[in-house]
């Protein structure tokens, strides 16, 4: 199973609206164009208290940056910005 690490950049937001359940995650890959392979994968974030937040990779954000949109339930806290996320690729083959 393919795994990748990523960094939480912040919430998806607009001019007047913020979506705390949607986090922008920059995947740390050798080739950022391969971020699309992780769409529909599962993301995990663990805070310093041991709480685990689970989310699903919804789509790419931007064209070539290696950034994806992840929907977490429950939403990530604001302190997660800059934290490390582990993303597991969907499918069994890897």
Swiss-Prot record:
GO terms for cellular component: ribonucleoprotein complex; ribosome. It comes from Aeropyrum pernix (strain ATCC 700893 / DSM 11879 / JCM 9820 / NBRC 100138 / K1). GO terms for molecular function: structural constituent of ribosome. Keywords: Ribonucleoprotein, Ribosomal protein. This is Large ribosomal subunit protein eL33. Belongs to the eukaryotic ribosomal protein eL33 family. InterPro entries: Ribosomal_eL33, Ribosomal_eL33_sf, Transl_B-barrel_sf. Pfam families: Ribosomal_L35Ae. SUPFAM superfamilies: Translation proteins (SSF50447). Signal peptide: none annotated. Gene3D superfamilies: translation elongation factor selb, chain A, domain 4 (2.40.10.190). One of its GO terms (biological process) is translation.
